């Protein structure tokens, strides 16, 4: 299995659960030239009518300033890897089984395929687990 694996810094923030709220944040980022490769939303676990948005990458002073202007910040409680490569049947199983055999637990997983390529975003509770997963998937 040939995977390309890299760490990514995820940014996050709250979004009111109403039409256009996420689009307003994304508009500011688009005008700043931010080319997002990962965007994920979910309900806030403790606040009704609020959602959470997670996105990456954001880098450089201008992009960071734009993200902060819409109340986004680096996610400090999650470490994430992006795994990419040639897609085939069972790719999710291959990734998950290699991590399971090594005893690495995931916090979250998102896998998508377009054409013959896949991208998997693996979330971990801490940087040590992400480092262990990186080693498992690249050796």
List the predicted regions and their residue ranges.
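A conserved regulatory-domain signal marking ACT and ACT-like small-molecule sensing domains
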Residues: 1-139
